Amino acid sequence: YLKVNSFIAFLLVSLCAGVLLGLPLPDLAKSIQKGLGDTLGSLVTIIVLGAMLGKLVASSGAAQQIASTLIRLFGEKNISWGLMFTGFIIGIPLFYNVGFVLMIPLIFALVQKFKLNPLMAGVPMMASLSVAHGYLPPHPSPAALVAQFHANMGTTLTYGIIVSIPAIILAGPIFAKTLSHITPKPLKTFAVQEVQADELPSISSSFLTALLPVFLLVFTTALDVQLGKDSPFSPVLHLISDPAMVMLVAICFATWTLGLRLGKSMEHVMGIYTEAVKDVGMILLIIAGAG
């Protein structure tokens, strides 16, 4: 009986809290509605566009291309470090649950290919995905904090990356070594489904598209600081450095590089975006309820 939907639970708690705090009953419903609107107002565009970008990066094979490239660069001996950086880079545009589902087949494929301990492969990547989801906008929690404290998204992202690096090193490869004595046996029912090599986007397109929001936020923030508030370009910079505008530019760019350019129809790409919105619907409601 106590397993209540999260959104409904937040509404009920808000209602009870309002009554116990002595808010006028006629104003209680309006107060709850205002909290919903104020919280979602600055976040819905960022979260929805971020989910769309992540879904396209995953379904187009760009995430697979990024992972394969980094693993080739790091080599078999340092594969844990390669997976750590893979998880971090992929985790910037992808939500944790999407990245987890996407990367699990890759981890099992590498475990089979290189005879690895599954924990040595999985822990570094999952730690990176988790840290990116918790520390870096445009993910829901950090984006909500940016909105609440009226912080600069680019500055928050920069500091988040700086703090994330030691966190993923400690929680990833270093922690994984302490688990080396544990050797789990993955179920054989996990089927590895990969995009064919000839259907993958190019390495440059994959990296550029996945990291474009990061590049734009850091570049516009640095340029704004360099030029100063009195610059005639300041109003334009403020517009294009707005997180919602950055994500809109990124999604338009991704529609071409990972969609139309690869021969996919506009209808197919828009279908991917529709599925992405379904994936984050409950997240948006929970965030709204918390407001």
Q: What are the language-model segments listed below?
A:
Residues L25-G35, I66, P142-T155, D224-H238, ...:
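Membrane-interface helix termini and inter-helical loops of multi-pass transporters
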Residues T158-G271:
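Long, contiguous bundles of hydrophobic transmembrane helices that form the permeation core
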Residues P24-K113, G263-G291:
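Membrane-embedded alpha-helical segments and adjacent helix-loop junctions characteristic
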Residues Y1, G18-G22, I92, I168-K177:
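Membrane-embedded alpha-helical segments of multi-pass transporters/permeases
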Residues G18, N97, V101-N117, P142-T156:
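Membrane-interfacial helix-loop connectors
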Residues K3-L23, V44-L49, S206-V218, H238-L260, ...:
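Hydrophobic mid-bilayer segments of alpha-helices in multi-pass membrane transport proteins
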Residues E76-I92, K115-G134, N152-I165:
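Alpha-helical transmembrane segments of multi-pass membrane proteins
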Residues Y1-I8, Q112-M120:
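Membrane-helix interface "capping/anchor" motifs
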